[in-house]
Amino acid sequence: MAAEGGRCQKSYFDVLGICCPSEVPLVEKLLQPLEGVQKVTVIVPSRTVIVVHDVDAISQSQIVKALNQARLEASVRAYGNGSEKITNKWPSPYVLLCGLLLVVSLFEHFWHPLKWFALVAAAAGLPPIVLRSIAAIRRLTLDVNILMLIAVAGAIALKDYSEAGFIVFLFTTAEWLETRASHKATAGMSALMSMAPQKAILAETGEVVAARDVKVNTVIAVKAGEVIPIDGVVVDGRSEVDESTLTGESFPVSKQPDSQVWAGTLNIDGYIAVRTTAMADNSAVAKMARLVEEAQNSRSSTQRLIDTCAKYYTPAVVVMAGSVAAIPAIAKAHNLKHWFQLALVLLVSACPCALVLSTPIATFCALLRAARTGLLIKGGDVLESLASIKVAAFDKTGTITRGEFSVEEFQPVGERVSLQQLLYWVSSVESRSSHPMASVLVDYAQSKSVEPKSENVSEFQIYPGEGIYGEIDGAGIYIGNKRILSRASCETVPDMKDMKGVTIGYVACNNELIGVFTLSDACRTGSAEAIKELRSLGIKSVMLTGDSSAAATYAQNQLGNILAEVHAELLPEDKVRIVGELKEKDGPTLMVGDGMNDAPALAKADVGVSMGVSGSAVAMETSHVALMSNDIRRIPKAVRLARRTHRTIIVNIIFSVITKLAIVGLAFAGHPLIWAAVLADVGTCLLVIMYSMLLLREKDSRKAKKCAASHHGSPKKCCSSSHHGSHAKKNHGVSHHCSDGPCKSMVSCKESSVAKNACHDHHHEHNHHEEPAHKHSSNQHGCHDHSHGHSNCKEPSNQLITNKHACHDGHNHCADTSNLHDTKKHDCHGHEHSTCKEELNALPPTNDHACHGHEHSHCEEPVALHSTGEHACHEHEHEHIHCDEPIGSHCADKHACHDHEQVHEHHCCDEQQTPHTADLHPCHDHDHDNLEVEEVKDCHAEPPHHHNHCCHEPHDQVKNDTHPVQEHSISIEESSDHHEHHHNEEHKAEDCGHHPKPKDCAPPPTDCISRNCCSNTSKGKDICSSLHRDHHTSQASRCCRSYVKCSRPSRSCCSHSIVKLPEIVVE
């Protein structure tokens, strides 16, 4: 990638021969003397050399040639063409030959002359080391190549040829491994730099041109599946754009005319025409690439300390090694070979590659990881400061709040100016401003048929922390907060303190207040969550805003009063003063802002965070961290990343030092192993690189995989910690709830013989739950499949063993604290945005209370029943119910089957049943289109305004001598055509209610055919026979089961749509 500025060009080179910072001086001394080279930057972690040069004086190929003369394996990096590929996939021929010969030399015990192959192996791998050493010596620099060359020469002098061969092989192999290990980081940087394509298509002619040649205000065409090459505004078309590469947002963003689009983002579907607003080199992605590039050269205090130590460490160890070899020789000590070997071990250990790499490689990986998630951290020093933050100060407008204002009130003061004239003046002056309030006022004026004319405004001026000024039609207009009135010399200011939660603006002209307006703003989604996360990290959060105290207090209340301090009505200098006080009182301070007013405070803070793309250019340039999106939840993620990076650097430093000390200690203890010293040196470098690259991995994905895997083997836990899960409590062995969060596991809920089992599946998939059969006459089994459900169920702990209590809550909190008798059952099915209240204190001991709250419903239903067993399956979707249903009947068992799908009507009917009735009321067919109610002739006639779906049989028919204990078996089947829902009909079925307005009762659809068959009676057998005749032959064997056959592909269960209903067979 090349950035041109006049006759200069910035070129990028991959230099694989750079293995540690000790070779940086060599590269600089090779290139800086060349004519036309203006600046040389070496980035060791990514093995990149950036050269600013005159293209007429020296070309890229000449620079590559100069680097390769020192065997640095340089090549030109080409961004944007997608051709970046893995280089050095295999070791060089020198390394392969060296290794092969070294293996042959290992068989010298079988044939002694084979030992010479080790010497040949050393000679075969030396050429790259020798050439680099010569280049370093010519420029009077001491690097690792010279140290390794001396170590090889010393081993050969001691006639330890195998040692010499191992030194060369280990060093060259480790260099290749380091290159391969760091390729991922280099590839990540290449992808970041080449996000924007190098070509663009002109919308008018269809001509393909270079992106860098496209001028501002040129309309370019972007088709579906293409990457937007230049920043701009959509002028035609609509589409969804994936901005994850730039902002880290995972969801596509809808774009329509007047929407801003950014270079490097992907147009998913649809054609759009974009008018460019910047040159390719000044696009957001280009700025991001430059910031990351500059950040790599910004050293932290830890890195500067290590570099300083390394500067003196290498010469000191070289002198020590020379002394260890020279002094015994001069003193004519015995066993000189041992002292020479010890000197060589010290010499190899003189290169602090791993120690010097410990900080920059970790910093590089952290900066790249942050950039991938929409965080631009400008250097290792910022990352280090971010890890020690104790206080976070937030601006309000556009940071904590959305910055998307709405005009609540706009009115003139007095009779001097009309509303239309006032709107014209305000909108015209505000059209010159970039403040978030400005566009809202302009839009409001246009909605009142007032067109602003910014060209008529002169002498426009911004007063930070106060407002703006402009002259139009000979009148000087001041617009801003209360302070602007002092500047406008207004004598009277109205008292507006009683207006809570709004931002108050004033309009003044000629020393007189002529207008007042109020704007409201809401907190961003995730603001409270971000502040809570910071608090969990031990970071105090405060608000600094120039807005009114009322607006600041309102925002604090919206956040749940989680801010430690709130400072309102501040000027920019006040924010700077408070940030300084926070630094002195609490420690390192972080400041988050998005506007020009925040720039001084951002610069004053230890770490300033701007809102990036949406923020002002001044704030982005002044800040130390830029958010490429408006999600401030990335701030605690940045703090976590910084702290994790700090820990990684500490581990790298400790490991680097310990390995050096261990090798030297081993040598002084009488075991001077040169090959071990080489392995410790280059091997430690490799391990430091690999450990640092763990920062590139995403921790959340590993946790999610771990959670998903654990739930396959542990059905009882069921993702209790997930955001979409539910909380359930076990009540004395009576009720066990299994709540499955967003895991794709199939969970079975088990219970004791006297317990009730409720299995709730809350997920974002179409999952099905299979549950084993449970045998007991008093058991109740309910299986509810909820999609996108959030549940919080609280159940009483003082239930008896036959109590049945289920709390099913979708997007709701349903609580029951009543004391239940052992024959009571309480079902609370709370659905989306519903409130369910139960009052059971007035009920007799045998009462059964059922409350089904649906979407936007408030339901209170006292129910009195004599029942010992009950099966309830309720399917409600998009219901709006407000009903009170007193029901009284004497039943031994009860079965109610309600199938309501997409019916926005009321089905509340009332029927008073006499005790021990033997009448049969089968379920009726429901149809959206044909609003008819079909009744079987065996059922009693009901009034026209009642819709009853009841199936009753005498009490003595329930008991069966051959089946004293009921067996409940539940199976789940899925069909592309239909879903069948079966229930046991050996119980009485009843749905009796009353609705005050019969006209609101609408029959359900006909395509869902529902039958309740009770074949234990003669009437039930007649119904079975009728099923044979009514094209339901396949279901004749299931006559005594209640089933639903629906032709629709999607069903509902408990007001949750698009949930595939299981087939439930109760036998």
UniProtKB/Swiss-Prot annotation:
<keyword id="KW-1278">Translocase</keyword>
<feature type="region of interest" description="Disordered">
    <location>
        <begin position="760"/>
        <end position="790"/>
    </location>
</feature>
<dbReference type="InterPro" id="IPR018303">
    <property type="entry name" value="ATPase_P-typ_P_site"/>
</dbReference>
<feature type="region of interest" description="Disordered">
    <location>
        <begin position="711"/>
        <end position="739"/>
    </location>
</feature>
<dbReference type="GO" id="GO:0016887">
    <property type="term" value="F:ATP hydrolysis activity"/>
</dbReference>
<dbReference type="Pfam" id="PF00122">
    <property type="entry name" value="E1-E2_ATPase"/>
</dbReference>
<keyword id="KW-1003">Cell membrane</keyword>
<protein>
    <recommendedName>
        <fullName>Cadmium/zinc-transporting ATPase HMA2</fullName>
        <ecNumber>7.2.2.12</ecNumber>
        <ecNumber>7.2.2.21</ecNumber>
    </recommendedName>
</protein>
<dbReference type="GO" id="GO:0046872">
    <property type="term" value="F:metal ion binding"/>
</dbReference>
<feature type="transmembrane region" description="Helical">
    <location>
        <begin position="313"/>
        <end position="333"/>
    </location>
</feature>
<feature type="transmembrane region" description="Helical">
    <location>
        <begin position="94"/>
        <end position="114"/>
    </location>
</feature>
<dbReference type="Pfam" id="PF00702">
    <property type="entry name" value="Hydrolase"/>
</dbReference>
<keyword id="KW-0472">Membrane</keyword>
<dbReference type="GO" id="GO:0022857">
    <property type="term" value="F:transmembrane transporter activity"/>
</dbReference>
<feature type="compositionally biased region" description="Basic and acidic residues">
    <location>
        <begin position="975"/>
        <end position="996"/>
    </location>
</feature>
<dbReference type="InterPro" id="IPR006121">
    <property type="entry name" value="HMA_dom"/>
</dbReference>
<feature type="domain" description="HMA">
    <location>
        <begin position="9"/>
        <end position="75"/>
    </location>
</feature>
<dbReference type="GO" id="GO:0005886">
    <property type="term" value="C:plasma membrane"/>
</dbReference>
<feature type="transmembrane region" description="Helical">
    <location>
        <begin position="140"/>
        <end position="160"/>
    </location>
</feature>
<dbReference type="InterPro" id="IPR027256">
    <property type="entry name" value="P-typ_ATPase_IB"/>
</dbReference>
<keyword id="KW-0862">Zinc</keyword>
<comment type="function">
    <text>Zinc/cadmium transporter that plays an essential role in promoting translocation of zinc and cadmium from roots to shoots. May control cadmium loading into xylem. In roots, transports zinc and cadmium from the apoplast to the symplast to facilitate translocation via the phloem. In nodes, functions to load zinc and cadmium to the phloem for the preferential distribution to the upper nodes and panicles.</text>
</comment>
<feature type="compositionally biased region" description="Basic residues">
    <location>
        <begin position="724"/>
        <end position="735"/>
    </location>
</feature>
<dbReference type="InterPro" id="IPR036163">
    <property type="entry name" value="HMA_dom_sf"/>
</dbReference>
<dbReference type="InterPro" id="IPR001757">
    <property type="entry name" value="P_typ_ATPase"/>
</dbReference>
<feature type="compositionally biased region" description="Basic and acidic residues">
    <location>
        <begin position="760"/>
        <end position="774"/>
    </location>
</feature>
<keyword id="KW-0067">ATP-binding</keyword>
<keyword id="KW-0812">Transmembrane</keyword>
<dbReference type="InterPro" id="IPR023299">
    <property type="entry name" value="ATPase_P-typ_cyto_dom_N"/>
</dbReference>
<dbReference type="GO" id="GO:0008551">
    <property type="term" value="F:P-type cadmium transporter activity"/>
</dbReference>
<dbReference type="GO" id="GO:0005524">
    <property type="term" value="F:ATP binding"/>
</dbReference>
<dbReference type="InterPro" id="IPR044492">
    <property type="entry name" value="P_typ_ATPase_HD_dom"/>
</dbReference>
<dbReference type="InterPro" id="IPR036412">
    <property type="entry name" value="HAD-like_sf"/>
</dbReference>
<feature type="transmembrane region" description="Helical">
    <location>
        <begin position="117"/>
        <end position="137"/>
    </location>
</feature>
<dbReference type="InterPro" id="IPR023298">
    <property type="entry name" value="ATPase_P-typ_TM_dom_sf"/>
</dbReference>
<dbReference type="GO" id="GO:0016463">
    <property type="term" value="F:P-type zinc transporter activity"/>
</dbReference>
<feature type="region of interest" description="Disordered">
    <location>
        <begin position="960"/>
        <end position="996"/>
    </location>
</feature>
<keyword id="KW-0547">Nucleotide-binding</keyword>
<comment type="similarity">
    <text>Belongs to the cation transport ATPase (P-type) (TC 3.A.3) family. Type IB subfamily.</text>
</comment>
<dbReference type="InterPro" id="IPR008250">
    <property type="entry name" value="ATPase_P-typ_transduc_dom_A_sf"/>
</dbReference>
<dbReference type="GO" id="GO:0016020">
    <property type="term" value="C:membrane"/>
</dbReference>
<keyword id="KW-1133">Transmembrane helix</keyword>
